[in-house]
């Protein structure tokens, strides 16, 4: 699959946590080398589930994705940034104005120096 992505993809979506990303990126880089592609031309995206249990009910499948604070989410985003992830897609629960406000706070913290 990585070889197909290396040859044809404009972007590759993975599901690895930040700590596993370096190993997975190395495998992708090797696949790029095999097909003569510069690995820098194949950005990686990840889906990230973020759940704030203090703001409402969380679906069972997201129980392990809970975050205690906006700072914790900002730290998670920083870890993906350090790992070289180009784009994060967020699934936020509960889907409420309060959760969106906390996500906005996390993004502001992530972007601050």
Pin down the residues of each PLM region.
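Active-site-adjacent structural elements that line small-molecule/cofactor binding pockets in enzymes
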Residues: 1-113
């Amino acid at each position: 699959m990585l070889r197909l992505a290396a040859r044809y993809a404009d972007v590759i979506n993975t599901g690895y946590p930040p700590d596993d990303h370096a190993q997975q990126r190395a495998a992708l880089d090797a696949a790029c080398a095999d097909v003569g592609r510069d690995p820098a031309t194949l950005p990686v995206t990840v889906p990230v589930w973020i759940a704030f249990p203090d703001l409402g009910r969380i679906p069972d499948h997201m129980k392990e994705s809970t975050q205690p604070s906006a700072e914790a989410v900002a730290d998670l985003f920083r870890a993906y940034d350090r790992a070289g992830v180009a784009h994060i897609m967020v699934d936020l629960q509960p889907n409420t104005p309060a959760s969106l406000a906390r996500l906005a706070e996390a993004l502001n913290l992530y972007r601050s120096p």
